[in-house]
A protein has these predicted regions:
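Residue-level recognition of beta-strand termini and adjacent short loop/turns
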Residues: 96, 122-124
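Edge beta-strand at a domain terminus
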Residues: 125, 132-150
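Tryptophan-anchored aromatic micro-motifs
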Residues: 23-38, 53, 102-103, 143-144
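Bacterial Sec-dependent N-terminal signal peptides
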Residues: 1-22
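A mature extracytoplasmic/lumenal domain signature
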Residues: 35, 44-46, 53-55, 107, ...
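Central antiparallel beta-sheet cores of small beta-barrel/beta-sandwich binding domains
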Residues: 28, 43-107, 113-115
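Well-ordered beta-strand positions
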Residues: 32, 41-43, 93, 119-120, ...
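Short, surface-exposed coil-to-beta transition loops
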Residues: 36-39, 87, 111-115, 129, ...
Length: 150
């Protein structure tokens, strides 16, 4: 009897982690914020999730006709880095119940980084909540998946 229980536990334990990874990986894909100005590809690196800008509605600065750069970044050493390819979502971990936490979101329009929580409301919709201090004092933006999952 002990052998059967031990074998059952050994086989059930890895399955739990495989299912959790599969559920967490639903976040992967290309997403568009509500303003339609960019598209962000969310990827998994190790056991964390990151999002980088892969498309811009206006990729070039109208004044220079050069690719838009991170001009408002508080770190002067990266102000000439192109926005396309910039990692704006960092360090998210899956916490269960279709929610990713402990990450940050960078807003290139004002050069600020905020704590962030991502909640998947359905297979093709994310509520991205950026905040300073406590989550209740933040702002939520709705992102839509571009590669629609059924």
């Amino acid at each position: 009897m002990k052998t059967i229980l031990l074998l059952s536990a050994l086989f059930a334990f890895p399955t739990f982690y495989v299912n959790q990874d599969t559920e967490a990986d639903r976040l992967l894909g290309v997403w568009e914020p509500s303003n339609g100005k960019a598209r962000v590809k969310i990827e998994k690196i190790g056991n964390k999730y990151y999002g980088k800008i892969v498309w811009l509605k206006e990729p070039n600065d109208p004044a220079t006709n050069q690719p838009k750069v991170d001009a408002k970044n508080p770190d002067a050493s990266v102000r000439n880095v192109p926005l396309k390819g910039y990692r704006m979502l960092k360090d998210f971990t899956y916490s269960g119940s279709s929610q990713w936490e402990n990450g940050t979101i960078y807003d290139p329009e004002n050069g600020s980084t905020y704590k962030c929580v991502i909640k998947m409301t359905d297979a093709n919709t994310l509520d991205i909540r950026g905040y300073i201090g406590i989550e209740a004092l933040g702002r939520t933006d709705v992102w839509k998946r571009l590669e629609v999952k059924k």
